[in-house]
Structure formats: C-alpha cells, structure tokens
Amino acid sequence: MRTDRTQRWVLALTSVASLMVSLDTQVVATALPVIRLRLHASLAALEWTVNAYTLSFGVLLLTGAALGERLGRRRMLAVGIGLFCAASAACALSPDAGALIAARAVQGAGAALMLPLALSLLTAAFPPERRAWAIGIFSGVTGLAVMGGPVIGGAVAQAIAWPWIFWLNVPIGLVMIPLVLARIPVGAGRRAPLDPVGLVLATGGALGLVWALIRANGIGWASPEVLTTLGGGLLLGAAFVAWELRAAQPMVPMRLFRSRAFAAGNTAGFCLFAVLFGLVFFMAQFLQTGLGFGPLGAGLRLLPGWATLAVIAPLAGSLASRVGLRLLISGGLAAAAVGLIWMALIARTGLPYWQLVPPLVVAGTGVSFAIPAAQGAAMIAVPSAAIGTASGTFNTLRQLGGVFGVAICAAVFATHGGYGSPAAFVTGFGPAMGACAGLALVGAVAGLLVPGRRSAPAAPGVMAELRPTETAR
C-alpha cells in the first residue's frame, strides 16, 4: 500500500515536532558548563535548568492530550509549537539562571501539547496496517534527537554561543505553524468535558512522583521532602485511578488497560526510556570524566548509538508485520541488557574508545528495535476515539520512565562512586550501567505479554465504552 501525499505531510510535520521536543530534553547537557560561567549559576540552578523542562513536560502531557481532544488536535499542535518557540526565545534572552529555569518550564508546557498530539495525528492519518511503519519512522526521529542532543548542544555552545541552542527552535517553529494548519487534515476528536478532577489528580500525582525522583539525588531518599512528595504523588495517583474508573467521561479510560498489548506496550515504553535516558546521561559523562574527552568530542563519540537509532527504528516498523511486536520488544531489550552489562564489565580509566563501540552498538541496536515496537503495541489496538488519550498516557509514562531511569542509575552511581577523580567516577559507572541493564530486562519481560501477532484487538468492553460522537475540528 502506497503512502499518499497527505500522509507524507503528516508524517514529516509530526516527526519534526517530535524532533524539536525530544532534542530539548538533552541539548543543554553539554552546554551546562558554559551556562554556569555566563549566568554565574550555582550547581542547583544548573540541575533545575534541565529538570524544569522534564518536570513540566512530564506532568502536563495528559493535559495536553485532553486539550487536543476537546479543542482540536491540529489547532492545539500549532498552539503548542508557538508556545514552545516563544519559550525558546525567552531561554535565549535569559539574563540570569532564574529566568532561564522559568522559561524552560514554559518550554516544557509547549512540548506537552506537541508530542501527544503529534503522535495522535500520525496514528489517525494511517490505517492500522500502515501504522507500525509510520510509527517506526516517527520513533527513529525521536530517538535520533535524544541521542543527538548532546552532540548538537556541545557543537553549538562551543562554536557559536549557548543561547543559540534555543534560538535554533524559533525559525523552525515559524515555518512549522502555517504548514501544520495547511497540510494536516482536520482531526476528529471527542466532544466531551475536560474532566477537570482527573486533570488535577493526574497532574498532582505525576508532579509529586517526578519531583521526588528529581530531588532524591540531591537531598536523599529519606528526606522529609522526598518522602512527602513521593507519598503524596502515590496517593493522588491512586485517587486518579479510582476517579477514572467511575467518571462519566474519563480522561484516561481505564478499560484500555484490559488490552494486553496496550498495558505491556506502556510498561515496556516506560522501561525503554528509563534505559535510554540513563545511558545517555552517564555515557556522556563517562566519555568526559572517565576518558578525558571534551563536550563536543564526547557527543561525537555517541554517534554509533545515534546511527543505530536512525537506521534500525524505521526498519523495525517494517519488520513488525513479519516477526511480531513481541519479539522486537523482548529481543531488543534483552540485547540492550547485554550491551549494557558489557559496558559495565569493561569500564575503566584509559579505556580505548574503540573497545566501547561494540557494546554501545549492541545496546543501541536493541533499543532501536524495541522503541517503535513498544509504541506500536500501545497504539495499534486503540479505538479511534481514544487515540489522543492513549498517546498522552504512553508519552507520560515514557517521560516518567526517563526521569526514573536517571534517578535510579544516579542513586546506584552515588552508592559506589563519585566525581572526586576519574577512577571514582568509573567505579560508580559500572554499577549504574548494571542498573540500566536490570531496567532493560524488566521491559523485556513486559514485552513477552504482548500478543504474538502484528496487531491485537481492543479488550472486550473497550469499544462499547468508547463510542462518543466524533466531530471535526
């Protein structure tokens, strides 16, 4: 089956939107030393320069998906791009660290509109038999942006100036907005209430959990602040589930999780991005602190992993129809675990870079096969009326997985090593990669629960519940 012109436009525009959002999750990492000098920022301020984006992005994803369903997916995608670009300009113009942190939080809010709506528009544009292929392209661009962020950030900060890592978003967004409004078809969504109680409970629960995960690395898991926010997040999360089970118009129809493919795909996606973010976070530092490369040099040496994501993720989308999603998810994550354990075993100061390439390629290849398969498993059996909420759920869990991956790997790292010397860093790096491998194996087990065929029907009862009147936006 051929892809028509409209579908190609949808694929291109939604992939660029995903690239913009995903790139900014990592792009500041290699520019932080320069930002610290130019803005006289403290270490805590640098931490929040990264975390403000992750925090607002993670907790507002479900809200973004719900707004798209109520107000129109295409329209709200354009609004999200505009907000993202305005915040990017504010980041570039920030006179101090506080202003930069505030602008990053707003940038995350724009991203929370862009990513779930991009995926829902893409999924709606393709028939079920072509969705796996389209999602493979989309996921490859997303993964490429995550891996390429440190390279681009280091190159721009070193060659031009740090504000340009944010200025780059502005012209892209100005071109994107009219193209989105002109080239993406008017979407169909649910004319339903926004479920404000669900929005408050979901946002509050996610905020508490993400805040605790981020703060625990700095002040300890036993601190009153972490325990309070973690407990509050869990309670609000439980209250959210209870509310959604009885709400007349739920933001997240809980019966979607009766689908094994949807439940397992979301679990695997959570673990996948925990692995990916943990790997990128520590590998970039290992190349600099442990092996002595500069920021740009470290980013460039991540290119083997970047290449696997660019090449294999689209291929995985095509393979799904022949080998099944279950094999791609479980096999890919098992391969990633092998590569991560390999890295942990060979890590040492003075390690020749060429010895690091094979395990990096193995891990990157495994992740590249699993990313589109997990996303496909979560979305392929979803009724059309629930595409927006399903994509918001998947992306929220994926983002929280990234935060969790960095937090758990950092906790393991701090237990065994530190930043006092290259040797101390390497001592902690090995166990951190071991923790990443453990997360990969958890995701591989979840992948075994995906039905062993190309697609799975929605769970009984889901279609009966999800028959709201669809209306064009």
Language-model segment annotations:
Residues I184-G189, T203-V226, V241-L245:
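Phenylalanine-glycine-rich, low-complexity intrinsically disordered regions
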Residues Q7-T30, L39, L43, T49, ...:
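12-transmembrane solute porter fold
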